[in-house]
C-alpha cells in the first residue's frame, strides 16, 4: 500500500519535552481528537503524554475527503424538530466557532472557500430546501443556488451554498496541531502502541482512538465501529472546475479540486 495522498508531504513531528514519572493525562491516539486534546490540556498547564501506535495522522484523520463543514450529520431542520430551536442553533453556532478556531490554528491547511451541497434528485432538493429555509429563519449565512455553472449545469436540480465552510488538508492540519501541542509542553510518542491501561503512568487517560478499537476499554469497542469509504486523487486537471468542496447523495459522494488542480473524490456505497 502506498503513502496516502494527504500524508505525502508530512515533515517530522516535534517530540516535545520528555516528561519523567507520572503525568497528569495520557492521551491514546494521535489523530485530530488526540492532538486537539493534548494541545488544549497542555496549554492549560497539564503534564500530557500522547501515545500513537504509528505516526501522527496515520489513521482516519489523515485519510478523508478534506472537508471542513458547519453543522452535523443531521439536516438542520430535523435537528430543530428533534432538539428544539435553541438547542439546534446553539450546536450549529458551536461548529461555526470551531471553524473559526481551526482557521486560527491551521494556517494554509484550511482554505475558507465555502461548500456546495448538491441535490441529486427532486426528493433531495426538497430536503435541502427545507434545511435552507430553517437556516435562513434562524439567521445563518446560507444561499440557495438554482442554476449551477458548468460542468454541473443540468445535472442537479438545486444546491445549498455554505459560505463559511472550507477545504482542509487533513494530514497537514493534524500535524500542525501536534506541533502546537508539543510547543505547549505535551510529550508526543509515535510508534508506541498501548496494550494496557496498566502500563500508562498517568493520573487520567483519554482514549482518542475514535473509530479504531483500542482494546483498552472493551465497552467502548462495542459502541464504536469503523466504516470504510474510498477517496482517490487524480493527476492535475487542465483547468479549475470546482472552486470549493462539493457533496451530494446525502453526503455519500463528495469531491473537491485542490490549488494544484488535482481532483480528490470519495464516497461510500
Predicted regions: what they are:
Residues 23-50:
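N-terminal Rossmann-like FAD-binding beta1-loop-alpha1 element of flavoenzymes
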Residues 1-25, 43:
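Extreme N-terminal leader/targeting segments of oxidoreductases
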Residues 15, 108-119, 147-176, 268:
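Helix-loop-beta segment of a Rossmann-like dinucleotide-binding subdomain
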Residues 34, 195, 212-214:
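Glycine-rich nucleotide phosphate-binding loop and flanking beta-alpha elements
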Residues 68, 106-111, 202-269:
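Active-site substrate-recognition segment that forms the wall
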Residues 126-127, 133-138, 156-203, 208:
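Helical element adjacent to the flavin cofactor pocket in flavoenzyme catalytic cores
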Residues 43-63:
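Glycine-rich FAD pyrophosphate-binding loop
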Residues 71-147:
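Dinucleotide-binding Rossmann-like beta1-alpha1 core, especially the glycine-rich loop
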Amino acid at each position: 500500500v502506498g503513502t496516502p495522498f494527504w500524508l505525502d508531504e508530512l515533515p517530522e513531528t516535534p517530540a516535545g519535552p520528555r516528561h519523567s514519572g507520572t503525568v497528569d493525562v495520557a492521551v491514546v491516539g494521535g489523530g485530530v481528537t488526540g492532538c486537539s486534546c493534548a494541545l488544549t490540556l497542555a496549554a492549560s498547564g497539564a503534564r500530557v503524554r500522547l501515545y500513537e501506535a504509528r505516526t501522527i495522522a496515520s489513521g482516519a484523520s489523515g485519510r478523508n475527503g478534506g472537508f471542513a463543514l458547519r453543522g452535523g450529520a443531521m439536516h438542520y431542520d430535523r435537528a430543530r424538530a428533534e432538539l428544539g430551536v435553541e438547542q439546534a442553533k446553539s450546536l450549529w453556532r458551536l461548529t461555526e466557532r470551531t471553524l473559526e478556531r481551526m482557521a486560527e490554528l491551521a494556517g494554509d491547511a484550511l482554505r475558507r472557500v465555502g461548500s456546495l451541497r448538491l441535490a441529486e434528485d427532486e426528493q433531495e432538493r426538497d430536503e435541502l430546501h427545507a434545511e435552507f429555509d430553517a437556516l435562513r429563519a434562524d439567521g445563518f449565512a446560507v444561499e440557495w443556488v438554482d442554476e449551477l455553472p458548468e460542468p454541473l449545469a443540468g445535472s442537479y436540480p438545486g444546491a445549498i451554498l455554505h459560505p463559511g465552510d472550507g477545504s482542509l488538508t487533513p494530514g497537514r492540519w493534524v500535524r500542525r496541531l501536534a506541533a502546537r501541542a508539543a510547543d505547549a509542553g505535551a510529550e508526543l510518542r509515535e510508534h508506541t502502541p498501548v496494550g494496557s491501561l496498566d502500563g500508562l503512568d498517568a493520573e487520567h487517560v483519554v482514549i482518542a482512538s475514535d473509530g479504531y478499537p483500542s482494546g483498552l476499554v472493551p465497552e467502548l469497542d462495542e459502541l464504536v465501529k469503523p466504516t470504510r469509504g474510498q477517496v482517490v486523487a487524480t493527476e492535475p486537471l487542465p483547468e479549475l472546475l470546482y472552486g470549493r468542496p462539493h457533496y451530494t447523495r446525502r453526503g455519500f459522494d463528495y469531491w473537491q479540486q485542490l490549488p494544484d488542480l488535482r481532483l480528490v473524490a470519495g464516497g461510500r456505497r
